[in-house]
């Protein structure tokens, strides 16, 4: 088991809950609210679900959240439910698609031996390493701030995550 800081665990656990919400609860709503989809499920799947099993489908979950995000009131204005669903969709996409493929800030920094700074001919390498490290720290700080902003955004819509 690898050690992970609490702040990282907090981020992962909360976005895991968002993922579960979309892929199970919203997917379930998409199936049970559509007679055609429900009927298209194999009988053994319907039986398992009727006995309390869990239904998971990313496609059905996203379809339901998109439908929810398109809801408007009688004046054609997006409802609060729709606005929250749009935020849910955006956060889900960020967590499952964008964030996993962002750059590793420390990949650009070469492994470096601190003892190299003692050798005169290695001082230039030391300066380059310090510059690379500074850029990595800045990128890591920006990514951490992005993570925090998204986590705060998730907390703002948490009361809307129900079906």
PLM regions: where:
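Long, non-globular targeting/processing and low-complexity regions
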Residues: 1-157
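Long C-terminal interaction/binding lobes of large macromolecular proteins
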Residues: 163
């Amino acid at each position: 088991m690898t050690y992970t800081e609490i702040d990282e665990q907090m981020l992962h656990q909360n976005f895991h809950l968002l993922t579960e919400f979309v892929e199970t609860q919203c997917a379930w709503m998409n199936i049970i609210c559509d007679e055609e989809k429900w009927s298209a499920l194999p009988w053994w799947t319907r039986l398992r679900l009727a006995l309390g099993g869990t239904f998971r489908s990313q496609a059905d979950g996203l379809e339901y959240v998109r439908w929810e995000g398109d809801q408007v009131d009688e004046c054609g204005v997006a409802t609060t439910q729709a606005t929250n669903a749009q935020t849910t969709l955006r956060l889900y996409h960020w967590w499952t698609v964008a964030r996993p493929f962002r750059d590793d800030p420390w990949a650009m920094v070469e492994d470096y031996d601190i003892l190299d700074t003692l050798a005169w001919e290695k001082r230039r390498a030391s300066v380059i390493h310090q510059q690379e490290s500074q850029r990595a720290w800045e990128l890591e700080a920006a990514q951490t701030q992005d993570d925090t902003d998204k986590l705060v955004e998730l907390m703002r819509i948490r009361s809307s995550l129900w079906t």
